[in-house]
Amino acid sequence: MKLTMYMGRAGTGKSYACYERIREIITTCPGEPIILLVPDPATYRTERELAAFMPEGGFTTVRVVGFGRLAHQVFQSLGKAREDSLSDIGQKLVLRLLLKRHADKLEVLRRAASQPHFADVLQGLLAECKAFRVTAEDLRSGADKVDSMGLAGKLRELAYIKEQYETMTDNLWGSDEDSMEELIRCIGDSPLLQQAHVIVDGFHWFTPLQNILIQRMFALAKESILTVTLPAETEPERYARPGQLFYRPYEVYATYKERYGKQLLVRRFTKQHRFQSPVLEALEKGYFAYPSQGNQSKDTVAVVRAYNREREVDAICRRISSLVREEGYRWRDITIMLRESETYGDILEKGLAQYGIPFFTDRRHPMRSHPLAELLTGLLEIVQSRFNHDAVFRLLKTDFFPLSREEVDLLENYCLEFGIRELMWLKPEWTYRRRDTGPEGSDSYERETLRVSRIQNIHSRIVPLWQLLWDFGRQSHTGYEWCEHLYTCLESLHVPRTLSQWSREAVAEGLQEEADSHEQMYKRVIRFFDEVMLLAKTELLAPDEIAVLLREGLDEVTYSLGPPGLDHVAVTTVERGYTTESAIVFV
C-alpha cells in the first residue's frame, strides 16, 4: 500500500492541498468515505475551514476527527460504545485506593504516596508508560540494570502499582491510551475504515501507540496521506540530530520511510503562502538558523513592554478596539496567544469584557469555587471540625439551604453574640437572650422575644440535617454508603431544582457561560459519585479519606464551552493554538 507524504514548512500549503484532494475525491468518487485525522483541539477549526472551502459550503462524506472522536465513532459503529469508562477523576480515585490498600508493600514511595495530589503524578506516569508501550516487566528489567538502589526500588514499586492498576481497571476503559489500544484491536471490523481515504494532518510527532494506530488505518485505507512539517528544500536527514528544531518531524518521516520504503511518495511544498508580511516569513525561516541573520525587510515585529499584566491587557484591548473601529478588521481576524492560560486568563477575560470585545477562550475553567463544590466539601468539613463557626457559615452561604441571606446574617450575629460553637449547634432549642431587655411585657422585652423566636425558627430548619451529618459522618463507611448519604443530603436540600432554577435565570440574563457551568458541575458530581460507588463499593473509607477524595476530585472538575458565534476574538495557548490563519496575533 502506498503512502503519500506532504512535506514542507509551516504555511507552504500542505493543509490546503489536503482540502483540494478531499474536494477532488468528492467530485470524482462521490460517496466514498474520507477520514481527516487532526489534533483534537483543531477539529472545530478544521471543520469550519473545510466547509467554507467546499463549493457547496459543506460536506457529508468527510469525518473530521481527533483520536478521541475517532475512537468514539468506531466503537459506536461496532456497538461497543460504553458508559463505564473512567474519567480522569476516576483514574486518580483508583490510584488513591490502590495506594491505601497496598501501603504496607511500598517502602520507597510510601512517604510520597501520602502527599496530596501524588495520584496526579502517578496517573501521568502510567499514561506515559501506556503511550510508549512500557510494561511492568520493562520497569522491573530497568530496575535490575540501574546502580542506584533507590531508583531500583522506585521502579519495582511502580511496576507493582502498574500491575494492580491494570488488574483493577481490566473491565473499564481508563485513559485515552486504554481506548486507543482497544481501537487498534477492533478498527479493522468497523465499516468506517473500509476502503476509506485517510488523511492525517496537523501533527508534529506521534507516540508509539499512535503510530501503530495510524499504520493500521493506512493498511485498511484505499488512499493514505500524511503531512509532515519539514523544510522541503533540503534533505530530511539534515535534521536527524536529536535536539534540532525539526528532529521530531524528522522522526515521523524516518518511521514511515523505514516502513513503506519505495512505497512512500513524497510531495514537496516550498512556496510560502501563509505569511503576507515579509518579516514573518523571514522569522519563520531564520529564527533558529545558524548563523543568525538580521531582518532584511522594512517591516518589524512590535515588542511591547508594560508595567504589569493589567496594563498589558489594557493596551491589547485598546489596540484591538482601534483595529476594528478604525482599520476595518473584524473580531474573528484577531487571536491572542498565551504561554499558559493560568497567568493571564482571568485578567484578560475581565479586560476584554470591560471593553465590550466579544471573545472565546478554549481554556477549561476550574469549578472548585462553585457553590455545589463548596456545599459538598462543607458537609464533611463541619463534621470533621466539630461545627467550626467559619465552616458552618461558609456552608450556609452557598444559598442551597432554606434560608435567605438576611436570615443567615441574623443567625451569624446571634452565634457570635452568645458564643455558640461546636456541638451547641445540635441542641434542639436555643434559649439564649439578652439580659438588659427590661421587664417582661415591655417593648424591648417583646422585641427580644420575637428575635429569639425567629432565631429558633431558623435554627430548627437546619438542625435535622446537622444531626444527620453528625450521626453518620463520624464513622467509617463504604464508598457506596458515603455517596448515597451525600446524594440524600443534596436531594433533601433540593439541589438539582435550585441549580436548574439558577441556570434558567442565567440564560434569561444572557449569562450562557454561568448557565452551562451549573449544568456541567452537577453532571460531573454525579459522575464522581457513580465512580466512587463502582470502585469503592465495599471499601471502608474513614471520614478524612472520603474528604480527601472529594476535595481532590472537585479540584479536578472543570468546564468548557463551545464558541457562542463565529465573529469573536480567539484566546488560546501555544499548546492549543491551532488558529493559525488570523491576520492579527498578540503573543
Language-model features and meaning:
Residues M1-E49, L192-Q195, I199, H204-H389, ...:
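Conserved motor-region signature of P-loop NTPase helicases/translocases
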Residues K2-Y6, K14, R101-G202, P236-A240, ...:
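Accessory N-terminal region flanking or inserted into the helicase ATPase core
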Residues M5-A10, E166-Q215, V304-I316, I320-L323, ...:
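PLD-like (HKD) phosphodiesterase/transphosphatidyltransferase domain
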Residues G31-S141, M149, G153:
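Conserved P-loop NTPase-based nucleic-acid remodeling module centered on helicase motor cores
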Residues P55, L70, H102, L106, ...:
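ATPase/helicase motor core of nucleic-acid motors
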Residues R63-R69, H197-F206, Q210, I225, ...:
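Conserved helicase core region in the C-terminal RecA-like lobe
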Residues G79-L99, Y287-S292, T377-L396:
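A polyampholytic, Gly/Pro-enriched intrinsically disordered region
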Residues S148, A152, R156, Q164-Y165, ...:
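Accessory C-terminal helicase-associated subdomains
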